[in-house]
Structures are given as structure tokens and as C-alpha cells.
Amino acid sequence: MLPGWHSIASLVKRIDIPIVASTTPAEIAEMQQDAWPEAGKYGLGWVYFSVILLAISTIIRFYHLWGDQIRIALHKEDMAGTSPYVTSPQEEYELPSAATDSSTTHFFPARGPLPSTNTTKQQSSISTIAPLNNTIAFVRWIFYRPIPVLRIGKLRIGFPSLGASSIILAALIFVTLYSFVPQPLYYSSISIGSPPLAIRAGMIAVAMIPWIIALSTRANFVSILTGISHERLNVLHRWAGYLCLFLSLIHMVPFYVTPIWESTNFMYYQQYFPRNIYIYGTGWAALVPLIVLCLHSLPILRAWMYELFKLVHLPLSIIFLAMIFWHSKNFLASWDYLWATVAIWMLSYAVRLFYVNWSNPLRLSFLIGEECAVTILPQNAIKVTVATQMKWKPGQFVYLRMPGISLFERHPFTISSLCSGDFPSEYGENYRDLALVFRPFGGFTRNVFLKTFEYGPYKTWTAFLEGPYGGMKRDMAAFDDVVFFAGGSGITATASHLLNLIKKMRDRKAVTRSVRVVWAFRSPETIDWFREELRICRDFAPPNTVHCHFFLTGLEPHGQDQLAQNQFYQEMLRDKMYNTLEGMDKRNSAYIREEAAGDPEIEKELRRENEDAITALPLAHTLPHINTSRHYTSPMDNNYQHAPYPAPHVSPADTPFNFGFPPSSTVFPKLTTRVGTVPLQRNGWRIDYARPNIPQVLKDYSRTFGRRTCVFVCGPPSMRVEVSKAVAQLQQVVMTDSSKDEIFLHAENYNV
């Protein structure tokens, strides 16, 4: 055997130092402290930590899923014994003399006993356990609250949600303690073995890599088990990468504290390795890509050079993984974690083939994509309509690539249309119109706007879709009350949920009895984006179930001279919307013909039922009403008085449905409807001219909440923060009121 062979072998292995005849008893005793063969347990420690978190999240997900399905099933069972013509989940108060064959509820029924006042619905036994519901409410009271933004001069630093931050903090504490608490941190000499601290940190870092990749992929097992979509897991992906860098630095530093070149075995190291390679070259080869990956994923840098980030992130990740293979040399079964990483990565890409619209050979879009039309909406918004055989659920999003706009760019957009047989595409019964609505800001969206402006709305484009991804992990139909908050283009994530919920309510498949929509936008033209969807909600929702509250925030006074003029404009615009909605309470004739499907007898019956509704007497002229609602603080001076104007001579049948917004700057006087009897409770549409006072709005709504309420918000960060704080505060109602079981919050990402 060559001289010094044992020393060279020990340096090659770097850490597994064999016991030979020359090893002293003191060195043997020191080597047994946190021995090298047992160091693999530190990688398993991180695996156990991650699996426990995954198991808890999965159990919570399936607990809620089970409870939601049981409540919906019990509701269907209750509805099976009632008349299919009763469509309103709330009472409709009518006078006894106004009864018709279409009436549903009376103060005094014509025959039989008085109706029972006991309307308690069946509930899932496990979902009504008060201590469990109170515990969940207490956890939400804590974790629904957002972390305040840190301001350092002009720099604003945002943090993840409190729940995500708690997981990140727990992981940081775990890996730090697991690295530094076991002893020893160093050996007396690196000739005995590599520093135990470095080995512990290195094994934990390697064990984290499969989880980092799993949290980054679009189709991953974490989303399948927990119901949390990949875009929400991305924050954990980034912070897990930062923790991996933190552990890699801990792994590196001890090798410089006890450097190999101070050992007597350094000369043998030089004999075994080429002299032109740095001693720790393989470690630096893996560390540098990791540093770059973490730095350019910082929010401030990623937003500044997003296109570059997308271009280099994947290649850098592949280089990093290859360098880790080279550096670790399969010590302590480290390659098991790395091969698991490769398997997760490849499996994700294989599964993604089922998410693209051009990979199915049974579809006409196979390898060529699908046609789409692009329309410019008011306020320069863009609507892309793709006729596709793809199926999706409300609130999901897709990645859109249009080679005619940009060959390789792919961007996520929320689907604003409903995938239902009630809304077939003109391409055929097997197709549905997938609608994407977004504002042009820069890059891809700006190019879409410019190309559409250049070629016009009649040009068709090729679209390649990937998805759908995301969506809610809870079923809205299992909640008694649903409240939607939307800010500006955030209505895109709300529209499909609203249509789907109304459809289920009409089909008697939803527990929901009340739906409230609060939409804040700057310009009246914004409502044109979803004019047809709102018309459907008003015409087809069960009576007295959908209430829409619009907040027009774009009317800001610019001086004292405009104060009175803006106030007058507000009052007139509000009144016109009221009158439009009141004057169109009947079912639209076009929908009657569509529902009759060409059968004259059914159409005749539907029109007769429509005429049975209580109608209003002619309109009267009164002074404009000044709104004094406490839902907002108006910046206008309410002391300004206006004089009545003559009524315009416009036929209601010739007036297009415009939700109260005039097509020009002409304003109209208030027209108040007088009725000859007590009407049904169908007035649920309202508009105000200020920013919504969200805490007060939710507080007022909470007085009529049922046992379970869902609050959905999609809007700018300020709106999400206000809604989160308000819902967190309302958890006290659940903990103190036995008639309330749950107030659930779902906050949608405004940028997707």
C-alpha cells in the first residue's frame, strides 16, 4: 500500500475517518461523539417535520370538505320534500288579498294549519361541535390578521400572511436548533473528521431540496393533498430556498474555521486532486447558483426584472441540482434526496401535459391550439374569449400563450366565465367560452392591447392554454351567507363564483340563502365589463337573495366650485340606477323565449306567471333624496339643495339596460316609484359615491348572518387588509354566539 493512503482516503471521503492502529483512544472517543454514520438522521428530521405539517394541513382540508358535502347533502334531502316551485330561501311577505297561483308564502294560508316557525335545518354532527368551532374561530381570530408593512424611509417591506409566516418561523427555529443544539460543533482537528455542525446543516439542506421543488411545480402532490394551489405555495417555496441558503452558509463556515490547509494531511490532498482545482471548489459550484436563485427571487428584484427572472430561474435551478450531485458524492445517502427531487420534477412536467389544451389527440386543438377573439372593453380593459373543450371550476386561472403576440411568453389570468351547459359556445355543444379579462400594464398585456388596437376585434388569434389551476378549497354552496368584495378588476375572480352559486341556488343544490356583492370601482364604464353577468344575476337569482352594492370611487372633488356640481351628479346618477333596476324587475322576454325552447305552451305559461308579479303605479316626481348611509363618509356637502327637473319622455322599453349609468354627461331627476301594495323584497341593488367603509359594512351584514358565512375578497392590497382585519374581528361573534358556527375568509391574489 502506498504511503499515506489512509490519509488520502480520509480526505476523499472528507468526513468518514476510519479507525486505524495509529488512532489514539482520545481521538476514538471524540469521533464517537455525533459519529459520522449516524449523521443521516438530521436529513430525516426535516422530512418528519415536513410530513407532520403536510398531514395537519391535509386533515384540516378533508375535515372541511367532509362537512361541506354533508351540509349540501342534508339540504338536498330537505328540499326533496318541498315544492320545486319555491325558489326563494327567504320569506316573501304578501298580503292575503294579493294571492295568486304563483304566490308562495302568505301571512295566513287559505287552508290547513299555520306554518311552523321551527325552521332549523339539519346540520352535520361533527360540524356543530361548539368547542371545535370556537377553537377554529380563535385560530382564525389570530391568523386572519395581516402583518403590518414595514416602512424604512421610502422602502416598504411586505410580509407573507401570518399563517405562512408562522410556518416559516417554525421551520427556522427547528433547523437552527437541530443544527446547533447537538454537540460537538467542531472536532479538535479536521484530521479526525469534518465539523459535525457542517454535516448537520448540510444534510438538512439537502433534505429540503425535494420539498423546495415540490412547492414550486404547478402540478404537485402538496396541492392535491391540501387543496392549496401552487401560486399560494410559492411563498413557502421562496422562503424554503432562503432557509436552504442559510443552512448552506452554516455548512460552509466551519470548513473555513478549521481549514484543511492547516492540517498535516494537506500535502496528500494535493497529490490526489489536480492542483488547478480549489480545495472547496465543488461546494462553491453549488453555493453560487443558490445565492443567485435566492437574490433574484427577492420581490423587489423580481418585480424589477420579471421577464429576466422567468428566463433564468429554471436553468439556474438545473445547474444548482447538478452541482449538488457533484458536491455531495452520495455521502450519507444524500443522492436519495436528489434522485427524489429529479423524480418529483419530471413527474410534475409529465402531469402538466394533461393540463394543456393542445396535448389531447382526441381534441381538435391537438398540437395547434385553439382560436380566440380579443375585445377592447371600456377603460382599455382586454377581454380574451377562447372557445375550448377544457373544463374549469369557478375562481381558477390558466396560463395564456398567444404566439401571434409573443412566441414564448406565458402569463396567468383568472377565468371570469362559468363552465356550464347553460352557457354553450357558438363553436358547438362540446365547447365553452373561456373568458379572461385584464388591464394592460406592460409587457405581454400591453402588446395584446396594441395588437388588438391595430388589427381590430374581427381578427382571431391562436391561443395555447395551460390549466386550470387554483380555485377555492371550500364549496361556497355549503355556506348560508356569502359576501363578495371586489376592487376594480378584482371582479374577474368574483364573476364565475357568483354565476355558479346562483345556478346551484336555482337548482336547489346550495344551502346559501343570501349573496351580497360589494364592488368598488373608479369609473361607471367599468361595469360594462360584466354587464351581462350582472343581468343574469338579477333576472335568474331566486327572489331576494342577491344584493349588489356598488361604490363609485372616481368622483373626487377638485375644488369648492365643483362641490355642488359633483353632489348633484351623484344624486342624479344614483337615482337613475334605482329606477333602471326597479323598472326591469320582470323577466326579460328574450330569456322567456330561450327557456321555453320554442314550445308555445310553455312560453305562454311563463309569460302568464311573469305578469302575476306585483307591478308599480306610474312614476311620480319628487325632490332628489340625499343618501345618509353610515356605510361611508361622503366628502360632499349634503346641505346643497337642487330644484326638480321635468321628467324625460323616454320609453322604458327603448332604454338599454345600463345599471343606472348614463351614456353621456346628461343627468336626470329622481323618479320615485309608488306601489299600490306591499311588494316582494327584491330591492337589493344600490350605488354609493365614496370608498366603502368595509368594517362597518361587514358589521351591518353580520346581524343577519346564518350559521356559516363565507367572505370572498379580490382587490388591491388595501382592500384585502381591511377585509382580513374585519373578518378576524368577527370571529368573536362565532365564539360568543351559539347560533354562529363559522365565518370563513378566502382572499384571492389580485395579480392573478
From Swiss-Prot:
One of its GO terms (cellular component) is plasma membrane. GO terms for biological process: copper ion import; intracellular iron ion homeostasis; iron ion transport. Its main location: membrane. The chain crosses the membrane at residues 40-60, 157-177, 195-215, 241-261, 281-301, 306-326, 331-351, 482-502. Residues 349-475 form the FAD-binding FR-type domain. CDD domains: NOX_Duox_like_FAD_NADP. It is a multi-pass membrane protein. GO terms for molecular function: ferric-chelate reductase activity; metal ion binding. Pfam families: FAD_binding_8 (PF08022), Ferric_reduct (PF01794), NAD_binding_6 (PF08030). PROSITE patterns: FAD_FR. InterPro entries: FAD-bd_8, FAD-bd_FR_type, Fe3_Rdtase_TM_dom, Fe_red_NAD-bd_6, Ferric/Cupric_Reductase, FNR_nucleotide-bd, Riboflavin_synthase-like_b-brl. Glycans are attached at residues 118, 133, 357, 627. Belongs to the ferric reductase (FRE) family. This is Probable cell surface ferric reductase kap2. The lineage of its organism: Eukaryota, Fungi, Dikarya, Ascomycota, Pezizomycotina.
